[in-house]
Amino acid sequence: MCVGIECHGFGDKPAWMDRGARQKAEAAKMKQKVTQVARNRRMNQFRDQNESSLNRIHNRRTSNSQPSTRSINNTTTIPASNNEPLALSQPPSASSQNQVEKDQLSTYHQDSINVAIDPLDTIDSSLPDFQTVFDEINFLTDQTFDLPEIDWTSTNNVPITDNTANMGVTNGLRAGQYVPRSQKQIDMDFSPRDSPSMLTISDVEDAALLAYYVSKVFHWQFRFCSSTMSGFNQGYFIWLMSKSRPLYLASLALSSSYRSFQNNAKEPQPCLKYEEHMQRYDIATEELQGHLKGHTPMNDVTMLACIVSFISSSFLHSGRIDGNVHLKAGVSLIAPRISRQQSGTLSDVHKTPEESSRDFLTGSIIRFDILSAITRDTVPSLSDSYRRILRSSSPSILLETVSGCQNWVFDILLDVYALRDWKRNTRAVGLLSLWELTAKANMIKSDLERRITSNLMLMNESKQEVKTQEDENLQSRHYKHEICVVTHTFACAVSILLEVIVSGAYPQVPEIKQKVGRALESFAYIEDPDILEVLTWPLFVVGCVVEEDHHECFRQLLSSTQLVRSIGLYGLKEILEKCWKSRETGEIKDESFDFSHFHTYKSREILIA
């Protein structure tokens, strides 16, 4: 490429190379010509890129049979300065759409020209070293002398940032992928306000609550989901949260309450004020109600997660958040799913994250529904459907991953509930047969005791394995042992419930006394006090029937410093005190004792689960 500089080849030295004024003047002209050529080349490159970009846009527009209008409606105008907010432009008419695109590209390239770096301009020509070096240049090359390729810098690869952190990733834009401004303006097909996938972390407090939820609250809610069998973990929950504003808000509210409870646990009388968290729960509840009106298959999963979070919150704010109401909503959501599952239309092989999450959260609802029936007058409405799932040889739902207790205990518990309702109904019409009652109870008892014996053997074996074998599978064996311990504790409590239904709540009756003693021994197998967090139901059953000599033992256990931070057991001591007082005063007779007497406490319904 000719730059208009005369080349003297290998001849005599030109007259102007006198190391004086003439040489400096000639050097200045050379510099000017080189600079001009560099600028011309840069402009040609910009022009070629402009035409190429327009061609790409034209091809993309003509290749789509139904061009999207939403992308233009949501086009983001880049502010002139960082202090100006992002503004959404008005949608152009169809006739001017092509001109808008050209103007946008023109603006983008003009900005690129303004910020482009001139390699020669970056050197200060006033410096002595520069002038000396330039003066010594001898263009003694052949006649085809050409300039080297000059690198240029544009804004194509400069990411456009926003001061707001967002959960979720937009279509066509992934973390770490830089998109030119023009492409981002035209292809952006979302509005943070309108898209449910974009959840704004509005301030540092929300970010702190989110981090606290992932590190602390999740483990409290789903202690046993760390197993690979659960098909669920923190990552899945965050993924669901990124798709649901109600779930995101409910999780932050729960995190706020949980953190406050833990901070106040050191007080002599820990008290959690709902008013401090009321605004968060109110907004989350409003969002949940709106989404329940028009749910989709994906919404079903996120709504289940949201409902489970509200049920967990009810243990912290039982006087303000009715867990039973949310549980009913959850049951109504899983009912169609369970109906399809028992017809064999669903497969548990190669589950997607959505399917795995749905099964896990469905198991959480089933767990709450079955256990809470202890204080209700009837069995769960979906008992038959639950049985089919729990008795499956390869169940897609494992309740041990949500409660630590295996499926067979919940299956037998449903049979015990059914016996309770049968006895109540036949007695009401004067047709109760004690012989028939005993026969039905013995069938359940035989199966239950056989299972307890088998699980006890597994528990002892797993204990020995944990003690004697230390390798990469130690954590898995420890998890297996914990499942056996929790399952044994629940099963012992179910055996007490069965005896109470048959004989009444007489602590001195040999059968009941023996079952209560075995249940108390089951608590001795627990090595980690945190496991008591999931044993509210067994502690409630055993505590209501235990002899008076053991009342003080329960008081000390539930008031111990190890359990003062236990949310699952929060308020259980007061409920047991009410039960003991009612029995001591004769308000509730042993022969007519029923756990449903304690479905309310301080004029509010309670949820034992």
Curated annotation (Swiss-Prot):
The ranges the UniProt entry gives for DNA binding are 1-7
GO CC terms of this entry:
nucleus
Q: Where is the composition biased (Low complexity)?
A: 85-97
Q: Which Pfam families match?
A: Fungal_trans_2 (PF11951)
Here the segments flagged for biased composition (Polar residues) are 51-84
For this UniProt entry, what is the primary localization, expressed as one broad class? nucleus
Q: Which GO terms describe its molecular function?
A: DNA-binding transcription factor activity; metal ion binding; transcription cis-regulatory region binding
Q: Which UniProt keywords apply?
A: DNA-binding, Metal-binding, Nucleus, Transcription, Transcription regulation, Zinc
Among InterPro entries, the record links this protein to: Fun_TF
What are the boundaries of the region Disordered? 46-104
Example GO BP: positive regulation of transcription by RNA polymerase II
Give the top-rank taxon of the lineage listed in the UniProt record for this protein.
Eukaryota
Compartments it resides in: Nucleus
* PANTHER family, A to Z: TRANSCRIPTION FACTOR, PUTATIVE-RELATED, TRANSCRIPTIONAL ACTIVATOR PROTEIN UGA3
What function does this protein fulfil?
A: Transcription factor; part of the gene cluster that mediates the biosynthesis of meroterpenoids.
Q: What family is reported?
A: Belongs to the TRI10 transcription regulator family.
Protein name, as recorded = Transcription factor ntnD
